[in-house]
Amino acid sequence: MNDSNYSPSLVSALKIARGMALQDKHNTFGVSHLVMAMFAENTGLKEILSSMQKDVGYIMEWFDTHREMYRSSGTSTEEVEPDEELSKVLDESERSKIKLGADSIDSICVFTAILREGVVYSHQQIEMLD
């Protein structure tokens, strides 16, 4: 994973997400880990969603529940890598960065990629977050 295109706050959130996975004894981390980390880190995501009158508490609970249900194969190691779904999201975030005209991939680019139908979640799952 090349994080040179990522904002400093996203790099910090990725480190937090890795730490969550280690704590949960996972050898990979997923979308739910990163979203929870983006809410924990000062990325601006919470404030932007609040300004859009989204129920941030519900969104956090939804992703936290998914994190609790997360299963990774293998055993915990010091090398915790993004799973396949998160890798797709991070790739798709580059497209979001271009569309949003951002200088670097940040939490908004990532969250936009997560909510793009078919990248990770179905239309029905995404509707639950609206």
Language-model segments: residues:
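Histone-fold recognition with a strong bias for associated Lys/Arg-rich disordered tails
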Residues: 1-130
